[in-house]
């Protein structure tokens, strides 16, 4: 018998499934969370800086903070497709606007993606869904568990944003016949 998943791991799996189903239902994804090891590595590099910004702003602007994680995922996926060798070492500050985290969304949509029509509605919908999912968990604010759930929600939003952008760029998983 498999050991029971801890609460945070189960939350992450449930949130990922929820957002994947929601994004698939609205046509943003096709039932699969597209990813790349390079994009995942970029998240690991940017996560500490992003978490710092998001934690400071979450109480006042929770959905904005979650949306910015998705925008960051979209931007990383876009740059990965364009010329990853050129962009892979860019600092976190490259993704922030003139006012830092406060206009990160506009900076990414206007200056990197150059596509508000697709990215803004996608992230507004996903961030609202993710925030409501997080609030349904009823964790006590200020606790270690609430913080862990927040971190997981941000990470999942990054991955969903990256998957949406990869899908928009035409990437998809295909079954390959490896036989002779």
What are these regions (language model features)?
Residues 1-180:
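Intrinsic-disorder/low-complexity detector
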């Amino acid at each position: 018998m498999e050991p029971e998943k801890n609460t945070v791991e189960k939350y992450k799996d449930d949130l990922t499934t929820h957002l994947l189903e929601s994004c698939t239902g609205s046509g943003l994804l096709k039932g699969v969370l597209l990813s790349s090891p390079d994009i995942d590595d970029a998240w690991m590099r940017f996560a500490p800086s992003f978490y710092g910004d998001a934690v400071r702003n979450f109480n006042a602007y929770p959905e904005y903070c979650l949306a910015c994680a998705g925008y960051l995922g979209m931007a990383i996926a876009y740059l990965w497709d364009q010329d990853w060798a050129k962009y892979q070492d860019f600092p976190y500050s490259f993704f922030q606007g003139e006012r830092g985290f406060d206009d990160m969304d506009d900076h990414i949509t206007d200056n990197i993606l150059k596509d508000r029509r697709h990215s803004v509605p996608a992230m507004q919908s996903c961030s609202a869904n993710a925030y409501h999912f997080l609030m349904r968990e009823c964790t006590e604010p200020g606790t270690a568990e609430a913080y862990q759930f927040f971190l997981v929600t941000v990470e999942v939003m990054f991955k969903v944003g990256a998957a949406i952008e990869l899908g928009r760029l035409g990437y998809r998983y295909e079954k390959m016949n490896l036989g002779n």
